[in-house]
């Protein structure tokens, strides 16, 4: 059973900590890099407000990504907007069932140490956790001793990358899965307007192919 912690009394946020994972605690106590992932369209196929565990299907190569992170002792953290909760399409219990199935499919021996979720919709206040707010990532960094400057964020939407950029993550990766195809031009235009001092250009990949995993491994080892 997944451990859960309600971070706010209004239940707009939920965090799952995987305490049993060997990578949960930093052995040295020092800051360490992590891989931050969006969920829908990156880890699992985006099926438009998924609420049933039977509909969970991993994106291509996701297990290989987790295996790579595990072999390099790099923790993985998922950050996800779940506006279907505030819209009334499903509740937190439904979300947890989907989460349990996702973790099961990733397999038990993986590097996932936490999942941060926000249940608010597009009209969420600016101080909420909803991406593009950096607050989910910043909370993860504080609680799990993550060095954001050496971390990676992988997303299919511009909001994922802005969330990472505004939290201090330098390595941004955009995938074509999920909403990636429709978002890519928007992302290219956004970062073309920024100077090199403001942000590094994102790395663009199609999916978690063997070639893409080599790129991710090179970033981690650099």
Residue ranges and their predicted role:
Residues 1-31, 93-113, 122-153, 157-222:
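Asp-based, Mg2+/Mn2+-dependent phosphohydrolase catalytic module
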Residues 62, 66-99, 111-124, 164:
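Substrate-recognition element of Asp-dependent hydrolases with the DxDx(T/V) motif
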Residues 42, 80, 177:
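Ser/Thr-centric signal marking residues that sit
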Residues 43-45, 86, 160-161:
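Catalytic P-loop NTPase motifs of RecA-like helicase/translocase cores
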Residues 52-59, 91-96, 130:
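Flexible, glycine- and charge-enriched loops at secondary-structure boundaries
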Residues 3-77:
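Active-site neighborhood of HAD-like aspartate-dependent phosphohydrolases
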Residues 48-49, 84, 120, 145:
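A broad detector of the eukaryotic-type serine/threonine protein kinase catalytic domain
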């Amino acid at each position: 059973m997944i451990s859960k912690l309600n971070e706010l009394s209004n239940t707009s946020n939920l965090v799952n900590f995987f305490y049993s994972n060997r990578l949960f605690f930093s052995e040295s106590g020092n800051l360490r890099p992590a891989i931050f992932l969006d969920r829908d369209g990156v880890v699992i196929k985006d099926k438009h407000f998924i609420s049933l565990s039977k509909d969970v299907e991993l994106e291509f190569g996701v297990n290989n990504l987790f295996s790579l992170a595990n072999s390099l002792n790099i923790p993985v953290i998922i950050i996800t907007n779940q506006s279907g909760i505030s819209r009334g399409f499903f509740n937190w219990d439904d979300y947890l069932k989907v989460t349990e199935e996702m973790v099961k499919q990733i397999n038990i021996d993986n590097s996932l140490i936490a999942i941060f979720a926000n249940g608010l919709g597009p009209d969420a206040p600016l101080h909420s956790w909803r991406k593009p707010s950096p607050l989910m990532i910043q909370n993860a960094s504080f609680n799990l001793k993550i060095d954001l400057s050496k971390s990676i964020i992988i997303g299919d939407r511009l909001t994922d990358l802005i969330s990472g950029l505004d939290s201090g993550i330098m390595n941004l990766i955009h995938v074509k899965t999920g909403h990636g195809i429709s978002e890519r031009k928007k992302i290219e235009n956004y970062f073309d307007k920024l100077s090199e001092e403001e942000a590094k250009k994102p790395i663009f990949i199609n999916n978690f192919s063997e070639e893409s995993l080599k790129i991710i491994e090179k970033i981690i080892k650099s």
